[in-house]
Amino acid sequence: MSTTVRPDEVSSILRKQLAGFESEAEVYDVGTVLQVGDGIARVYGLLKAAAGELLEFPHNIMGMVLNLEEDNVGAVMFGASNAVKEGDTVRRTGILASIPVGEAMLGRVINPLGEPIDGKGAIETSIRLPLERRAPGVIYRKSVHEPLQTGLKAIDAMIPIGRGQRELIIGDRQTGKTAVALDTIINQKGKGVYCIYVAIGLKGSTVAQVVNTLEKHGAMEYTTVISATASDPAPLQFIAPFAGAALGEYFRDTGRHALVIYDDLSKQAVAYRQLSLLLRRPPGREAYPGDVFFLHSRLLERAAKITDDIEVAKKMNDLPEALKPMVKGGGSLTALPVIETQAGDVSAYIPTNVISITDGQIFLESNLFNSGQRPAINVGISVSRVGGAAQIKAMKKVAGTLRLDLAQFRELEAFSKFGSDLDKTTKAQLDRGARLVEILKQGQYIPMPVEKQVAIIFLGTQGLLDAVAVDHIRKFEEDFLAMLELKHPEILKSIEEKGSLEPDTANGLKEAAAKFIITFNEKAKA
């Protein structure tokens, strides 16, 4: 047997081997941690990093680029920074911070990175949208004209909210801000509005309570809760509202209606201040960074009512590629930001900023809350700048004088404390005002359909309730509405379907009320 080596055979074998060789090498842009602590890392070597880009730290901790400096990058970390040390390798991902979106997110509790935290398993969705996105331009918008009913008489009558509006809920702690927001979510049942509740810096127990309340009222079916609690790192609290806006934009741009609640933005501003100071950005008023106004304006401007023209909507600025095939016109994103004040001071920095950005505010007062008026809305300084155009005709008609009547009542009430001898007209006005205040009181988590609101407010403003004792008004309201549903459903149906209070419907309502008041008063005396 010949043992001679044949060079041509060897070279052909080598050629075959080389032809089948595949390079498995992957190229990563990596940097080195120079300094780390308090959730902030300074990284050297990431020359091509982009602002808002995600970084991968050791131990699967994600971070995000916030500062681009001459010789290093300032990054915030979404996990425990004590697991990372000086000299560790950091990898660029090339992806801007984004969140998974889709119908699969409904009914779930997630963190601001889109990861489920409710123990119900993974979320199956293929679309991701960037957290930061420019607001739709003027040409892609439509003026607010459809109502978003909160189910709260005081708001729907005097401070109406329209789809695509930004309405601020502002007040001291423990005045019912979250309750107003939750009532609004519960009232969207069956109305085709998808809700996103963003909890920023709240206690974990409070978030659990919110989820429990929504589940109890069947509202989690159309709601997503995004939670960044007080124990979560400041960077997560900072990006949480942007995650909520991105999820809301998915529904808005696919021709549907969404409602996002930011509870609350004052805590997001505090988290942003913390990050900015640690990144050595220059402080401004109340130590907030100079761009804290831009932080909130760029977030809240993303709430909009989109034009009905699909062809125009498809050309919307900054539209992510993943959404382009699904775009439809006529969608909306309504924002209800919450701001907490200190001792009723609405002239502080963050409250004045957000008041100037939004289309109106609902101001809740602790004095009213403690006196038993709930929701504790101060009608005097609460306003809706664009919601009037979205209010249904029936409500506009019956509640037209309500704000003025209440303002006069408050003035006369203060005046009447000084003197006991009041003339008949003043006394009548005070009695009417007391009944109107009583009408606007409402229990928690029992939002009322708009047709029932119209019916009861109509009785109050027309003076039909003057014959009912003030302390019996709440009971009368309950019994009267139950009677209407049972014996005169056509009245409520007419208001609901036509959206206006026709003369024959108004007369029918007056007659039904007059008869019912007599029997009600007889029962009350017995």
UniProtKB/Swiss-Prot annotation:
GO MF terms, alphabetically ordered: ADP binding; ATP binding; proton-transporting ATP synthase activity, rotational mechanism
Entry's EC annotation: 7.1.2.2
Residues annotated as binding ATP: 171-178
Pfam families: ATP-synt_ab, ATP-synt_ab_C, ATP-synt_ab_N
Xref: HAMAP family: ATP_synth_alpha_bact
Assembly information from the UniProt record: F-type ATPases have 2 components, CF(1) - the catalytic core - and CF(0) - the membrane proton channel. CF(1) has five subunits: alpha(3), beta(3), gamma(1), delta(1), epsilon(1). CF(0) has four main subunits: a(1), b(1), b'(1) and c(9-12).
Function: Produces ATP from ADP in the presence of a proton gradient across the membrane. The alpha chain is a regulatory subunit.
Name of the protein in its database record: ATP synthase subunit alpha
Annotated site, Required for activity, chain positions: 382
Organism: Chlorobium phaeovibrioides (strain DSM 265 / 1930) (Prosthecochloris vibrioformis (strain DSM 265))
Listed PROSITE patterns: ATPASE_ALPHA_BETA
Protein family according to the UniProt entry: Belongs to the ATPase alpha/beta chains family.
Recorded topology in the membrane: Peripheral membrane protein
